[in-house]
């Protein structure tokens, strides 16, 4: 939003009054499509097929007018919705409005985030590495080795539409915008017959707006959860994110406590007293880990179920939240299989007369790379077949030799970079072998030569291309280990995000 600094210069006390007029600003939709102020490209076009026509805010105004004129909350007796409003272009029209909504309702969030950053600029400057995905793994290594039980929880979604709008009321105080947003959500949700279908279409066509609603819901849920956790714990949380102020927050907390246990807040604080409760969220899931007995984990499990059911009207079955022992459970976490194993350490004790060995058992977090899912991803991206045998990439034969090699090297480098924390390196060596041989087969196919002849011509140069950068990095970090193959784990603190579409050849980690 740096292209539009004028929107962020609004007076703090009046900023919410300006949100509704922004719906009719063409620059908002240019920002939504990341086209700057270029008015030759947008989805605000008259024809659904022609993407090069000029902006037409007449469509937006017409849609909003017709939405206000209709009674959208009336549903027929058989449960179906007769919706002539959207017509054949319902996906297009909903996308037009959702893109504008997404940018506009993000403005109050962005203003508060910027002000929060200004207050904590020095603290943020000291810890830029905490934004890396790999930064969570050293934390798990330090903490999980001392814990005993773990619950892997899927955060339920979607919530009720009115709950979503009420959640946004604490952020967006513009009544007109909220009213229009409520109308749009009801109209859009009722346009589809099954929940599964509308969620899929909503995610594909309106990912920015979908993520905004989801993040606001998660922010609300975690605000309550971490508030109770911090108040009930012997030690305050030091790694939780920034949660902004909202109206009547403490009133809601008190009401939630009454609904849950029917007692005062001091009782619930002692009810959940635990100095070793840890919470991690990632990719729509959360992890709860604790020490000693599973009794406390059971209490937190039912607390979460009641929180979702009574506060967000989302159904969640307690039986689907399992409590597992860390020593007997392998956690599929951000592309790694993680589990806690007992490692024996033998120490020789020498006295004047006797010497004896002491075997100490120590817990250690092991992280390994799941080789089969990686091979499946490479297979879907056409680097190998389903059995893991390398194949050529015919779509790349039109490129130059240097471009082909650079592309394969970049893919191999990204995979090695992200999975460098694996305790076992053999799976990574197999992935490198697949990519290297796929590159050779692609070059041989381009030059109409055999793989054997092409390898003889290249010699060891191609292998050096795939291994050079990793060797340089290790030589800088571990000078003593540079002369031999380093087998230890390395966590990089410069990976802010990854793409979840690991099977998509054009949108996965393989193309970065």
Swiss-Prot record:
Keywords: Chloroplast, mRNA processing, Plastid, RNA-binding, tRNA processing. It is found in: Plastid, Chloroplast. The keyword Nucleus does not apply. The keyword Zinc does not apply. It comes from the Eukaryota. Pfam families: Intron_maturas2, MatK_N. Usually encoded in the trnK tRNA gene intron. Probably assists in splicing its own and other chloroplast group II introns. HAMAP family: MatK. This is Maturase K. It comes from Oenothera glazioviana (Large-flowered evening primrose).
């Amino acid at each position: 939003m740096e292209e539009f600094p004028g929107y962020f210069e609004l007076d703090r006390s009046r900023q919410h009054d300006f949100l509704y007029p922004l719906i009719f600003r063409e620059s908002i939709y240019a920002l939504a499509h990341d086209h700057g102020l270029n008015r030759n490209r947008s989805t605000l076009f008259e024809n659904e097929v022609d993407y090069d026509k000029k902006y037409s805010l007449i469509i937006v105004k017409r849609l909003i007018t017709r939405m206000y004129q209709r009674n959208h909350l009336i549903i027929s007796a058989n449960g179906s919705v007769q919706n002539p409003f959207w017509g054949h272009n319902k996906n297009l029209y909903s996308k037009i409005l959702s893109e504008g909504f997404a940018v506009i309702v993000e403005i109050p969030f962005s203003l508060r985030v910027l002000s929060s950053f200004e207050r904590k600029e020095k603290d943020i400057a000291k810890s830029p590495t905490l934004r890396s995905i790999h930064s969570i793994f050293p934390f798990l290594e330090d903490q999980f080795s001392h814990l005993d039980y773990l619950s892997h929880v899927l955060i339920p979604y979607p919530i009720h539409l009115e709950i979503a709008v009420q959640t946004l009321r604490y952020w967006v105080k513009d009544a007109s915008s909220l009213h229009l947003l409520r109308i749009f959500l009801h109209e859009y949700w009722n346009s589809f017959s099954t929940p599964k279908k509308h969620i899929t279409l909503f995610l594909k066509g309106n990912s920015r707006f979908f993520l905004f609603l989801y993040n606001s819901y998660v922010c609300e849920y975690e605000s309550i959860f971490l508030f109770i956790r911090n108040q009930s714990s012997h030690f305050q949380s030091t790694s939780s994110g920034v949660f902004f102020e909202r109206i009547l927050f403490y009133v809601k907390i008190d009401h939630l406590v009454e609904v849950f246990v029917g007692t005062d807040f001091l009782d619930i604080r002692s009810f959940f007293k635990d100095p070793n409760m840890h919470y991690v969220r990632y990719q729509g899931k959360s992890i709860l880990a604790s020490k000693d007995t599973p009794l406390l984990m059971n209490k937190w499990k039912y607390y979460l179920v009641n929180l979702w059911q009574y506060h967000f009207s989302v159904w969640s079955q307690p039986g689907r939240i399992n409590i597992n022992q860390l020593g007997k459970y392998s956690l599929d976490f951000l592309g790694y299989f993680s589990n806690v194993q007992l490692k024996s350490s033998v120490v020789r004790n020498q006295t004047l007369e006797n010497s004896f060995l002491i075997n100490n058992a120590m817990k250690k977090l092991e992280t390994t790379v799941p080789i089969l899912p990686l091979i499946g991803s490479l297979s879907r991206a056409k680097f190998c077949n389903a059995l893991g045998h390398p194949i050529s990439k015919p779509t790349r034969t039109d490129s130059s030799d240097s471009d082909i090699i650079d592309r394969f090297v970049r893919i191999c480098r990204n995979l090695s970079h992200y999975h460098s924390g694996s305790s076992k390196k053999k799976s990574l060596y197999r992935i490198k072998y697949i990519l290297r041989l796929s590159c050779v087969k692609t070059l041989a196919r381009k030059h109409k030569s055999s793989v054997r002849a092409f390898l003889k011509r290249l010699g060891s140069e191609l292998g050096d291309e795939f291994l050079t950068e990793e060797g340089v990095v290790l030589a800088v970090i571990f000078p003593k280990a540079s002369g031999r193959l380093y087998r230890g784990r390395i966590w990089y603190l410069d990976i802010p995000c990854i793409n979840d579409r690991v099977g998509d050849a054009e949108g996965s980690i393989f193309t970065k």
